[in-house]
């Protein structure tokens, strides 16, 4: 089956053609080999077209400070609970470059896979890179992986939320959209079979389409094995647009919207009832191929923020199901209303609260509205009196009597002391005169 669609390209190396820079769109032809896929489906990296402003050239310089998305978290308190050690997180993306020093020891290349075909549907040779998925000519997957599990390094305050988790690199897509629903489904199954506890998918369908059976079955395969599947909600939210995207909309998948520095939905972030939570997705610092960092925007970088939290929970509570981990993240999210809304889901993820506000023996199965923001109590208003009440008058007069009495007593006491002192002085004068005669 031959499918023609529109691909919203993600950020590349900072050099895109004039048309691409203006529109962020490129026409692509996708060959889908699955007989089970009955509808057109194209996949896209979930990064706004306007996000690529030239900052994401690579290799790059180090970002010296602590990014705002990490400043909002007490990392010492968070990592006292869990660092993600022992948990594998699959990054299904454009590959993960292990030459960046913060990712070299974070990536398990032996478990990686490259699912891009040798040639595209036009018969043109694709620059696939190695078979382990550890080459990334786009830079997208490398940034995603860094947000999850980048190791601490001198000269930068950037680090992954789960700095001891292990990344499984799966190269399944590229800047031209050569990934398909079939290869995405294969990637999910590969991740599960290689022992992933969490899967991050920062891509979605470019157009609203019906679910694909092969993709749905792959997601179900992961969930049945307690694997948490996190997916970006998409970046078609400008103007309040609501568009259902996959795999984010599948039952059991934690769909992540993007929030800004004010814990509000980022303007581009996709809205919908399928949104589970939101996470920082504006001015997101992360690793790039080779070395260094860059800043980017998009739900592509909100999803790995949540995947990192999921890895922390998975390491601390390995017996929990995927549903319980997702529910815990949703239940403990920061929100301004008691329930769910289609902009930020159950709220903006709170990593520390997700790890500390928990009953290990009774994990949350589904988020509850009453567990969100408590409603404020009505203020207690004092009675309004025009003029002085009888009680107030009695209190005032009583005060006057007491104060007046104290003044009189003090005056009398003072007079007595004065008389006494005067008598003593006269006595001393008289006594002094007799002695001298």
Which functions belong to the PLM regions below?
Residues 93, 157-175, 199, 321-333:
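Short helix-loop-beta-strand segments that form the rim/entrance of peptidase-like active sites
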Residues 116-126, 258-300:
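Catalytic-core environment of secreted peptidases
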Residues 147-148, 281-349:
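Hydrolase catalytic cores
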Residues 318-412, 432-435:
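C-terminal subdomain of the subtilisin-like protease fold in secreted/lumenal serine endopeptidases
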Residues 424-437:
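Cytoplasmic C-terminal tails of single-pass
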